[in-house]
Amino acid sequence: MAATWTAYAAGVTHAASNKVYAQIFATASNTQIIQIRRIWLINAQSAAVTGVISGTISIGSFSTAASAGTPTTITPVAHDTNNAAVNANITINSGNTTNGTAVNVYRTIPFGSDEPATGTFKLENFYSTPSTALIWDAGFEDTRISPLTIPASTAGGICVYGTMTAVGNIDVAIEFTLT
């Protein structure tokens, strides 16, 4: 079984311009294969905000890392405490305000930043409920489908990014393996 980690970015605020919610990026010196198995979005907005149901969040691959802004380093948590530490040539962070150089977009979804609530029958409450969404699960149970992969000795990364109205915040969880 491959060594598995979860990288969790908590409370990342939305931005009116492009925003990097979470990225995993490897330098060309990286010696491990990174495979993205699952990605979750969690609407973490708890206080009442004006209903906002417009905006998109995407998953894409990048040839250069996002760099603008002041990113927050994400320390991944190993699923097995016997796993070796993540390679120092792998960077995991969130909060950048400018994307790196995009190569591919794998998925784009609409996402609402309104607080999830079921107490009223407003459209935005239905749009943001459930508050947790699995947005990438390809290749986890089906060995015929490859997960998102960053090959060893290749500079590149996978990024969860979007353009939303600057209201609310989100958590992002990325489950990945290293081999």
Question: Locations of the language-model features?
Answer:
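Surface-exposed, low-hydrophobicity beta-strand/loop segments enriched in small/polar/acidic residues
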Residues: 1-179
